[in-house]
Regions:
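Alpha-helical transmembrane segments in multi-pass membrane proteins
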Residues: 289-297, 320, 324, 328, ...
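Juxtamembrane "helix exit" motif at the C-terminal ends of alpha-helical transmembrane segments
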Residues: 294-311, 372-385
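Membrane-water interface of transmembrane alpha-helices in multipass transporters/channels
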Residues: 306-321, 383-395
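Non-transmembrane, extramembrane segments of multi-pass ion/lipid transporters
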Residues: 248-282, 333-356, 413-419
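Hydrophobic packing positions in regular secondary-structure scaffolds
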Residues: 1-268
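Interfacial loop-to-transmembrane junctions
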Residues: 414-434
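Membrane-helix cytosolic exit motif
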Residues: 336, 411, 416, 438-450
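Soluble-to-membrane junctions at the N-terminal ends of transmembrane alpha-helices
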Residues: 275-291, 350-369, 393-394
Length: 452
């Protein structure tokens, strides 16, 4: 926790402990809800967590609750009275309530639903039925919708009356009499337009939207591609049912990037926070791929064993194996990360595989030649090896870099073609293939050049 945030939170705790209620509420109103929630994460005493939360002003307690960890949310939900729980759910945005309930055990979900009003309960159940990680599970129904026959005056009056309870008023979505999405209009355009103008005359009909079943990664890509702050969500009949705002998509992007990074490092993704995870939990998510890579490394051992005669004739070759496999592995990893990232951004398509291969092969040739030249001079000057040995190692290094660059681009694209996650191929598969291929190249070149 940053020093300034920690200082503000400690001040809140001091005011709470000293019973200075008015000063506490004033300080709480001046502190961002997310900072209060972050401070509560470090409080181990559940009694103090409950006490501080109950002292918060009612107009910010729901915002703080939305940012709290699922464990602390469960603590508060189980400890709250029916009246407190009803007030909390009523004050929260619906999408935040659904996010909270998705992490809760059945007894907490039941308690929350029992204390929600009938309409809210119906909406929550509807949201919980949407597929996980879909646009429907992310959206909120707290948005401003305007009929196309509204005048600007009527639209502004409507926004003033209802806008306080909406997640955003900066983009208003326009619907027809059947609630079908027909366009959108910005608050800026409403402010500058004459009051007698009809919404249909100033709205933008080129509206980007998602359906309730769209995957959250697709929605996130739309936000990035079109520079959106919100997106409309429609059903199969193009009727407006909700919107997704940028704050929820930022969370999605963070989750997806974290998941991809873990996969690329051969770690099974987990939703649990690192500091909250137990040792055996971390072991369970790392050990499977470590086992797979250890067993697959047998291929490299087999290759070395097969060329024992070459090594016996030139033992010095053994010293350069780590450098060759390490350099090739690094090159393959650089290429795979670049390709995976560009595929995720939509800048590289499967149909581009030949162009990508040609480009990466040329990059590999240039990088490999540069490394080989430097390595040859290094070996001649500092290692004291013969010209032949220096050439064997340097030529192998260049070819291994070219090979690794090619494998690094083809494996992720091949994985995507087969419907697999390209990130899974980044570290474990590339390491195994590149190591084995580099050793094979090394010993074959050595056999030819040494006549063994």
């Amino acid at each position: 926790m940053e020093e300034e945030i920690r200082k503000d939170f400690l001040e809140l705790m001091r005011l709470m402990d000293e019973g200075k209620i008015q000063e506490f509420k004033q300080k709480a109103n001046e502190t961002p809800p997310v900072d209060i929630a972050e401070g509560l994460e470090e409080v181990e005493d559940s009694g103090r967590v409950l006490k501080l939360f109950r002292m918060l002003p009612k107009d910010i307690s729901s915002d703080v609750f939305a940012y709290m960890t699922s464990d602390q949310q469960q603590l508060i939900a189980e400890s709250a009275t029916n009246a407190e729980l009803t007030a909390l759910v009523d004050d929260m945005f619906l999408d935040d309530t659904v996010d909270f309930l998705e992490e809760m055990p059945a007894n907490v979900v039941k308690k929350v639903l029992q204390n929600a009003d009938e309409n809210t309960r119906k909406l929550i159940n509807q949201f919980l039925n949407y597929p996980e990680n879909s646009a429907g599970s992310l959206m909120t129904i707290e948005y401003v919708d305007l009929h196309d026959y509204f005048t600007v005056r009527k639209a502004m009056d409507y926004i003033r009356r209802t806008g306080i309870d909406k997640e955003t008023v900066y983009t208003c979505y326009v619907i027809d009499e059947q609630r079908r999405l027909v366009g959108h209009v910005s608050l800026r355009k409403l402010i500058v337009a004459p009051e007698s103008t009809y919404i249909r005359d100033i709205m933008d009909t080129n509206t980007v939207s998602a359906t309730t079943t769209d995957d959250q990664e697709v929605v996130a890509e739309d936000f990035r591609h079109y520079d959106l702050t919100s997106i409309a969500v429609t059903d199969k009949e193009n009727r407006l049912v909700g919107i997704i705002t940028i704050d929820d998509i930022v969370d999605v992007i963070t989750e997806e990037n974290t998941e991809d990074i873990k996969k690329m490092a051969a770690i099974i993704p987990s939703d649990e926070e690192y500091m909250d995870a137990g040792v055996m939990h971390l072991v369970a998510h790392r050990l499977p791929w470590l086992m797979i890579m250890m067993i697959s490394a047998t291929l490299s051992s087999t290759i070395i064993t097969s060329f024992e005669s070459v090594l016996a004739g030139a033992v010095v070759l053994t010293a350069f194996i780590p450098m060759l496999t390490g350099s090739a592995g690094n090159s393959g990893s650089q290429t795979s990360v670049t390709i995976i990232r560009n595929m995720a951004l939509g800048e590289v398509e499967l149909g581009d595989w030949l162009r990508v291969l040609w480009k990466e092969a040329r990059v590999g040739v240039v990088c490999g030649a540069a490394l080989a030249a430097v390595n040859f001079l290094r070996m001649m000057i500092f290692s004291g090896t013969t010209v032949v040995i220096s050439l064997i190692v340097s030529v192998t290094l260049m070819l291994a870099i070219v090979m690794a660059s090619s494998v690094g681009c083809l494996l992720p694209m091949g994985a995507k073609r087969l419907g697999l996650d390209p990130a899974v191929m980044a570290s474990p598969m590339i390491t195994t293939i590149v190591d084995a291929a580099s050793l094979l190249l090394y010993f074959m070149i050595a056999s030819v050049m040494l006549g063994l």
